[in-house]
Swiss-Prot record:
Enzyme Commission designation: 4.3.2.1
Localization in the cell: Cytoplasm
InterPro entries in the cross-refs: Arg_succ_lyase_C, Argininosuccinate_lyase, Fumarase/histidase_N, Fumarate_lyase_CS, Fumarate_lyase_fam, Fumarate_lyase_N, L-Aspartase-like
Catalytic reaction annotation: 2-(N(omega)-L-arginino)succinate = fumarate + L-arginine
Pfam families: ASL_C2 (PF14698), Lyase_1 (PF00206)
HAMAP family xrefs: Arg_succ_lyase
Lineage of origin: Bacteria, Bacillati, Actinomycetota, Actinomycetes, Streptosporangiales
Family of this protein: Belongs to the lyase 1 family. Argininosuccinate lyase subfamily.
Name of the protein this chain belongs to: Argininosuccinate lyase
Gene name of the encoded protein: argH
One Gene Ontology term of the molecular function aspect: argininosuccinate lyase activity
Spans traversing the lipid bilayer: none
Length: 476
């Protein structure tokens, strides 16, 4: 059964059809429930398009002025909620064209369609939207990195057990560990900025796929919409969505990085670890167990990482088999990336609050730092500095661990006689590295956990935060 639209419905196609689409097709095709968020960008594109129509001699001065007034009114009505999509509007473009025609009349309103297609419109609008959101997400990431830096600075002298395979490995400073989570987030920001260079191309002027024959200037539209250039190939401009997929990848990578932090926070907040206490404002309780204090933000972040990965996987699956140029499958590119944006924008502020307000149990971390024979590597490397070959030094350090296990003691508990019995190379001077502080101080190369290097690293991280702030304030 054909769908009967009301008399106000605008359809951007249909002249060669004897009737309207079926109700089932109309419902399947409709996208205003998710693409309406692009309305502001669509209107900005229409303004720029009107100006190039005027520059090409296709609108006179009065027509351009009337068009711009109509678009200004439409934008105000969209912002206030006075104008919204109707059930018969197919997408954001048709809804806004209907609103535009209602404000300037069908004759002038119909002129705006000349020289553009929904194909080049949507390819441009999505770039505009994502470039703006990339800056918003960058600002939120910088807030989180700053919270990690603040916690690192507040705990600069706190040792903790560094781990590999979740087993005690070597002592490190808590500040060093926290910044190990901050740097991947900085790289996520760098990915967003690098992505922005590729997203900085307008597809306006590509038409449906072959470009325009009306003498329009794509570079003028690009400049007005905040792009540095227009696409060099009209087919690529309308059909490519790698820019969307790449954004979804960065969002998924951010999710993975947050999930790794979350896993540690969840462990550290357990009774067995007791490394941290989460603030009441960023924890929840149990409906049945009164004593519970649950790390919900960390758990939700861990779960939402899977959602972000799913957004990326779904998008790539949609894109993998599409011939050039535009295909309607590409309507499915927006919901995954919109979901990724929404997920990060609600998750990051909560995550930052959790990190900023957690309390560190310094004594507990310091107590566990030397346990699990975590100073064994220091013995081996001390021996290397005494010119003992590392293969032999490794064996000697391992023998120290074996003796300690047999006697139920830890490495610092070995007497001078014990050490000499294990190897004549183990003189009393080895004790300079048989303390957590000695171990930390010895890791003095760039990137190491020595206190001096960690202070330098913190300054470097603070500078990176400041350097990236400018991107969040730049015009997309």
């Amino acid at each position: 059964m054909a769908h009967e639209p009301d008399s106000q419905t605008v359809r951007l196609w249909g002249g060669r059809f004897s009737g309207g689409p079926s109700e089932a097709l109309a419902r399947l095709s409709q996208s205003t429930h998710f693409d309406w968020r692009l309305a502001r960008y669509d209107i900005a594109g229409s303004r720029a398009h009107a100006r190039v129509l005027h520059a090409a001699g296709l609108l006179d001065d009065a027509e351009l002025a009337q068009m711009l007034r109509g678009l200004d009114q439409l934008e105000a009505d969209v912002a206030s909620g006075a104008f919204t999509p109707s059930p018969d509007d197919e997408d954001v473009h048709t809804a806004l064209e209907r609103g535009f025609i209602e404000r300037v009349g069908p004759e002038l309103g119909g002129r705006l369609r000349a020289g553009r297609s929904r194909n080049d419109q949507i390819a441009t609008l999505v770039r505009m939207y994502l470039r703006e959101e990339a800056r918003a997400i960058t600002a939120l990431l910088l807030d989180l990195v700053a919270a990690l830096a603040d916690q690192a600075e507040a705990n600069l002298d706190v040792p903790m057990p560094g781990r590999t395979h979740l087993q005690h490995a070597q002592p490190v400073l808590l500040a060093h560990h926290l910044m190990a989570h901050a740097w991947p987030l900085i790289r996520d920001i760098e990915r967003l900025r690098d992505w922005d260079r590729r997203a900085d191309m307008s597809a306006y002027g590509s038409g449906a796929l072959a470009g325009s024959s009306l003498g329009l200037d794509p570079e003028a539209v690009a400049a007005e919409l905040g792009f540095s250039r227009s696409v060099p190939n009209s087919i690529d401009g309308t059909a490519a969505r790698d820019v969307v997929a790449e954004f979804a990848f960065v969002a998924a990578m951010i999710g993975v990085d947050l999930s790794r932090i979350s896993e540690e926070i969840i462990l550290w907040a357990t009774k067995e670890f007791s490394f941290i206490t989460l603030d009441d404002a960023f924890s929840t309780g149990s409906s049945i167990m009164p004593q519970k204090k649950n790390p919900d933000i960390a758990e939700l972040a861990r779960g939402k990482a899977g959602r972000l990965i799913g957004d990326l996987a779904g998008l790539l699956s949609t894109l993998k088999g599409l011939p050039l140029a535009y295909n309607r499958d590409l309507q499915e590119d927006k919901e995954p990336v919109f979901d990724a944006v929404d997920t990060l924008k609600v998750l990051l502020p909560a995550f930052t609050g959790m990190v900023a307000t957690l309390t560190v149990n310094r004594e507990r971390m310091a107590e566990l730092a030397p346990q699990g024979f975590s100073l064994a590597t220091d013995i081996a490397e001390w021996l290397v500095r005494q010119r003992v070959p590392f293969r032999e030094a490794h064996e000697i350090a391992g023998a120290c661990v074996r003796v300690c296990e047999e006697r139920g003691i830890d490495l610092p508990d070995l007497s001078d006689a014990d050490l000499a019995a294990i190897s004549p190379h183990l003189t009393p001077q080895v004790r300079e590295v048989l303390t957590v502080q000695g171990s930390l101080e010895s890791r003095a190369a760039r990137g190491g956990t020595a206190p001096a290097r960690v202070r330098e690293q913190l300054a470097e991280l603070r500078k990176a935060i400041d350097d990236h702030r400018a991107f969040t304030q730049s015009h997309a």
